[in-house]
């Protein structure tokens, strides 16, 4: 039985997700369809990549993931299928794959499958769903399109380092209004080398000078910074909504300033 997931920035008020599911179920009535989320911020491939990165390994081998964020195709950003870790990812090659996995992929192909309509505004329904059905029915990737040797890099969304400063952005705000940044533990340790630091939010308006292991390491309503199981720097208010109270949005700048050695 095929397992097919959907990740999109459509929200839940419109018909888009239902239309895609209908196309799939009309051909695979026994398929298991999983909504990972439809609440990705519009066009945020960094957020979509973060969500998928932290859940796809929990799915069984052979799972097919449809990613409907920034799906417009171009010569630079073609539609592709990528096989990695025994699973299949159908998306536009817009840099998202470098956010999902950073240890390579098994195979990638261009999608050379004709749509059943003359419209090009809903490729997730008219193309991605069709490809998902083909894969679920056992079609080899070579039947879908020619091999793609390399994938586009989403490095524009990686944290940058200059002198003693790591500058990142907020890539996800969770249901508790906690901020997840694109600053990894690895980069933090490499640059910091154990030095004291100041985490700056909204310039010098809010600062944090230590890492915690738990939200409850600080008093209620106090700010806390930690590295969660996802491996990224997370900033929160204990038992409060940081993003709302501090006026933080996706792509807001976060700095980690290390003291001079």
Would you name each region that the model predicts?
Residues 15, 19, 28, 43, ...:
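Conserved active-site and cofactor/substrate-binding residues in soluble primary-metabolism enzymes
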Residues 27, 47, 60-62, 66-69, ...:
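Active-site histidine-anchored catalytic micro-motif
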Residues 86-91, 95-98, 104-114, 173, ...:
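Conserved subregion of the PPM/PP2C metallophosphatase catalytic domain
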